[in-house]
Amino acid sequence: MVYIVFMLLVLLPVLAGWGRIFSHLFGAIFSGISFYLLAGIFTVATLFTLLSFFLPLNIYVEGGTLAVGLLSFFYFKMYRDFRLFLARNALYFIPLSLVTILFGSYFPFILDHFGYYVPTIKWLSEVGMVRGISNLDLLLGQMSVWHIFQAGFSNFSDPFLRINVLMLLVYVVYIFEKHSWLHFIFLPFLFFFCQSPSPDLPVIVISLMLTNEFLHFNKKITLLFIFSVFVFVIKPTMVWLPLFALLYGVVILKVRLKVIIPGILLLLLFFMKNVWTFGFPIFPLELFDLGFSGQPNAELLRNSAEMAIMKTYDMQYAFSEIERFSKLDYLKNWLFLSGIKGKIHFAFLLGLITFLLFCVKRKSRILWLLFISILFKSILVLLFSAQYRFFLDVFLVIVLVIFYETVSKKIPLITFSCLSVLGLLFLSFPGQLKDLIPSFKLGSFMTGFNTNQFYKPSHFELKKYETHQIGNLKFNVVQDYPFSFDTPLPAISPAFIQEDVDAGIFPQLKGNSLKDGFIWRKISAEEKEKLKIILKDLPR
């Protein structure tokens, strides 16, 4: 916890300083510290994305970023704003912050932390954004803007990757500044995302903040749209938010489309990033093939698409079975999956129906626009990969829309307190959660409370690997574990080596260094046998 407090003491003023520069140049969506912090996150994340094309996000980049942010913080005397905020809200804000920090100190338990988040951040901080890196490891082709942001602060300020704790505190500051007490209800749920740099947390938090502004008819549409696009570039499943912002501007505010130009420019940067790392504008889809080099092997992309469909059904059906589904079966089997995920899917459908009936009752244009946007997102996700985690934001937005005008401060605070205690018990004694919900697989990866958490966040260390070479690529393979989260670069997880072997290909360096990027080539029978020997006895 001490390490997380240090991270917050460093990064909160730094990001506020950057946000003050942004608001001085471009204005603000709303007043208060929370916007300065949000704008700081936006500005630094965009800057890091641009820099990562050319250089690693190392200690020198981090040092320069910290220096500029702190200079701005003191130049604009922003410590006065922080002091005033604490004077007004310290009684509730400080205990709530400590609870947030405590949640953030637990062991990471989301599997993507080890197979995707940490390796991505490692590449960005040590090498930068690498062209065609999806040829080495398809997952790395995503390179979320949130991980670019985290990577830039992973050298000194936040080596344990708890940036999501900071994002949650930005949200808490917003709640206090806006007196939007209903948002307290969402915090216990979000606490489960702050042990890892999961992009799910920032997109949910920012979408709730922006939706709150839309519902109060904020007219800063240019900024609302570009921040909505920012949410999309962090996680493209949030496509409903920029669509809603666009519809809100055109239908409600009746503005001209030129106001979306800054957002379109940010979107183009997102497409450039994806083309650079993946070869196509939108990961992991083979859409809009512009003929760029460095695209992954077609068989690997086909396997990825099939896996996404199987994950839609929680791996309870083989792809060949799913292909034989009728349109009715496709929906029915998704709704009635065995285990907790089927119940979540059914609750999602009930949520959409409830939202529809609420829109009919209220007869509000803005609510109808929001419903249309969420329905559009839902249909897209159903078509490509309807995993329950892609719908989590929708549940919270529906609750916000239905209750934001009617709930007093008392009910959210009581709900927050009860659910937070329950959440701490689950994280501290995960065996009870596994017994209560056997089908909740993530419960198996929770490790409980450790007294060392009071000093530094709990984290895993393995550092077991072997080095091999195929062609011009010397690579490291983790031992006794399926994910290469702390294996020196370049590292390839056993599962991806197996996919390469099955496809008869293997990645190669495009030039003389890792920064030059990767391509793939066919392998010889001798190389294939060597890879099979490497894979023998490795977990996959």
Q: Which residues does each PLM region occupy?
A:
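Membrane-interface alpha helices of multi-pass inner-membrane proteins
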Residues: 48-52, 188-192, 221-247, 262-268, ...
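Perimembrane helix-loop-helix junctions
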Residues: 76, 80, 241-264
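Active-site lumenal/periplasmic loops and adjacent helix-entry segments of GT-C-fold
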Residues: 102-176, 194-196
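Intrinsically disordered, polar/acidic, low-complexity terminal segments
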Residues: 296-313, 421-540
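Membrane-embedded, hydrophobic transmembrane alpha-helices
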Residues: 1-82, 219
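Hydrophobic, aromatic-rich transmembrane alpha-helices
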Residues: 17-24, 164-177, 326-364
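Membrane-lumen/periplasm interface segments of specific transmembrane helices
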Residues: 105-108, 258-334
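Hydrophobic/aromatic-rich transmembrane helices and adjacent perimembrane loops
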Residues: 122, 200, 206, 234, ...
